[in-house]
Amino acid sequence: TRAEVFDVANAVLDGTDAVMLSAETAVGRYPVETVRAMARVIVGAEQHPTLERAQHQSTPLFGEIDQAVALSAMYAANQLSGIKAVICLTETGKTPRWMSRMQSSLPIFALAEQVGTSAITALYKGVIPVYFAASTMKPSMINHLAVESVRKIAHLEPGDLVIMTKGDFVNVHGGTNTLKIIRIGDMIQ
């Protein structure tokens, strides 16, 4: 119905991560067509100009360091010209969740080793999970390999900018404390 179309569109504009059909709608005679129509509404709403820039309420105090890094990364991503993607190394999925709450047209790549973390981040708006086994890598190579794992997916070209967030140590929950702005093609450390 028209009301359901507006409900779906408004949910997207309000920053909802996922939508689902009600039992009443899902049991109709045309379930596949209903899902296709809902997908078209979602894509249309996501292309609305108000979603291209961050529109968040400023929190007076951050509760945690990783929250401050996540929100700072998204602010920089939306304000610095040339940023093509955000790369977020994550153990639990908490950092990309905070990032997804800030509306942006930029993709957020959540690099995680745990399948459960990737499954959770797949539900966040604008977040693309990528398997990344950081615990098997030399610490000096993690930044370079993280960018390389996203480069083809994001269609990154030399000169493009990406923002990366990560922690100093692998396998530490809530340890995101670093934000880097990286130019593709430059030596990454």
Q: Where are the predicted features?
A:
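C-terminal helical cap(s) of enzyme catalytic domains, especially alpha/beta-barrels
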Residues: 25-48, 178-182
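Long, charged amphipathic helices and adjacent flexible linkers at domain junctions
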Residues: 38-74
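Glycine-rich phosphate-binding active-site loops on the catalytic face of alpha/beta enzymes
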Residues: 8-31
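Nucleotide-binding motor/catalytic cores of P-loop/tubulin-like NTPases across gene-expression machines
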Residues: 95-97, 103-140
